[in-house]
Amino acid sequence: MKNLSAYEVYESPKTSGESRTEAVSEAAFESDPEVSAILVLTSSEASTLERVADLVTAHALYAAHDFCAQAQLAAAELPSRVVARLQEFAWGDMNEGHLLIKGLPQVRSLPPTPTSNVHAVAATTPMSRYQALINECVGRMIAYEAEGHGHTFQDMVPSAMSAHSQTSLGSAVELELHTEQAFSPLRPDFVSLACLRGDPRALTYLFSARQLVATLTTQEIAMLREPMWTTTVDESFLAEGRTFLLGFERGPIPILSGADDDPFIVFDQDLMRGISAPAQELQQTVIRAYYAERVSHCLAPGEMLLIDNRRAVHGRSIFAPRFDGADRFLSRSFIVADGSRSRHARSSFGRVVSARFS
């Protein structure tokens, strides 16, 4: 496993006034293939981002469409170098499935880390505007009624009640490799993670379809392009007894698709099952390749990670939250390249995909 980050230790205040040791990741990919996957903002670019964010005045939670539309317009004011790099990533031909952005303005007066994802705390911070401006350079922001309460920005925080779950609220078990919403034809094209508070033990794992293909035989690649796997709906979508137009079990579907030199991947270690013994064994081959070749990064405050949900899978390590108000706190949002693909599942001028269409 390659590690994308080096660490330096610093002391950050607890909400109680005590101190706690955390780690900050520095801009240091350890091998050349990942170097192009980092965008480091200069101090001038960060200042411009902070200034442009003031143009976004709508409420991120209660006026989500207006908020996103304002961010789309304001994004034209961002530095051309930043916009060009984000658009290059969005186009995708040369991306490795992720882009790490460093040097975002630090959020002052950050509220305590919430203990659940109910209250959309991240949406009330300046980070939501920074994140939206960057997101809207890549595509159009979208939300899902059945995921994170339909919030445009979801609080990714550890929950004591969900510590052992295969969801973003877990911490006591490794979050296994997955495509975000692998089961849904309306899944996001990109996942956006902005760090408000970090944890040195919480690593985000990344593994691209290109990395996978490089480990496989021609026969294995051909098999992965056949519809030989089923998947079920994610646990986080099943609250409130929801039903779905496509049912609970989906497929069979292929794991790989797209161009030979730019493959797409759909995978979920927890939810996918092969329809035959060879398919099940090949699924295990994919998992073994992930553990051997994945890269990792420890997100720190002022960093944002964009994941191309078509070209890469991701996961997260085990970590040990204290539930003291100073735990890991990420803001997650979703982006699509083409908003019209989900228009039938959203209300007029709405940004939220209705649960039954997921």
Curated annotation (Swiss-Prot):
Keywords per UniProt: Dioxygenase, Iron, Metal-binding, Oxidoreductase
A GO molecular-function descriptor: 2-oxoglutarate-dependent dioxygenase activity
Any binding details for the cofactor?
Binds 1 Fe(2+) ion per subunit.
Per the UniProt entry, the Enzyme Commission number(s) are 1.14.11.-
UniProt-annotated binding residues for Fe cation: 178, 180, 314
Biotechnological relevance: how is it used? Being totally regio- and stereoselective, this enzyme is of interest for biocatalytic purposes to produce chiral scaffolds that are of synthetic value in the preparation of more complex functionalized chiral molecules such as natural products and analogs.
Q: What does it do?
A: Alpha-ketoglutarate-dependent dioxygenase that in vitro catalyzes the regio- and stereoselective hydroxylation of L-lysine, leading to (3S)-3-hydroxy-L-lysine. Can also use (5R)-5-hydroxy-L-lysine as substrate, but neither D-lysine nor L-ornithine.
Family membership, please give it.
Belongs to the clavaminate synthase family.
UniProt protein name: L-lysine 3-hydroxylase
